[in-house]
Amino acid sequence: MAERVGAALGLSLEGEALAAGAPAAARAMEQVRGADRDRATAYLETLFTLAGVPPERLGEVRTCLAGLHQERHLWCATAAGTRESLERLRAAGLRLGVVSNSDGRVDAALRAADLRDCFEVVVDSALFGAEKPDPAIFRAALDALGVTPGEALYVGDLYEVDVLGARAAGIEAILLLPETAAAPDGVRRVASLDALADQLVPGGRS
């Protein structure tokens, strides 16, 4: 992404610089109270500002990113080992679903990443009509799976959106967060899906 934006706008951008700014960008996004698109804007503007983009050129960056997003969903990068971790969870008898603030393309993105078959249910906010942290979207996933809040566990990477939203629906939540990042007090956390599987699968690794 950095290389394509840089080439299109004549800016010197490196992926490493964007990665280094990701924790601060995530904190900026957490502070936004509003629609998910507003959180995304805060995240990207912080990310590119920290990577050295002058404030007067952020508008060009937003326009460029919007075009790239139409080509390929920018929020669907898959971490190494994701499928293996999901398969461990499923093999242990856990039923999996997705609740996503998105633009109607989550199902297609999961198929492109060869992950759709890992999930019984996918609830996309653009199709459902409400976004996290609204508890209604979490309840829709529960209803589709046929489980109660007490039988479910939600894992997400944003405290305000995922953890508080799940709790409002009566669901226990785990925050997916790098080990180096700070988390609010009293929040259960894991650093990766692999670590989650280690916690939830009886006997650990096979």
Question: Can you name each region flagged by the protein language model?
Answer:
Residues 1-84, 91-92:
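N-terminal helical cap/lid subdomain that shapes the substrate entry/recognition surface
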Residues 7, 12-16, 49, 56-62, ...:
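Asp-based, Mg2+/Mn2+-dependent phosphohydrolase catalytic module
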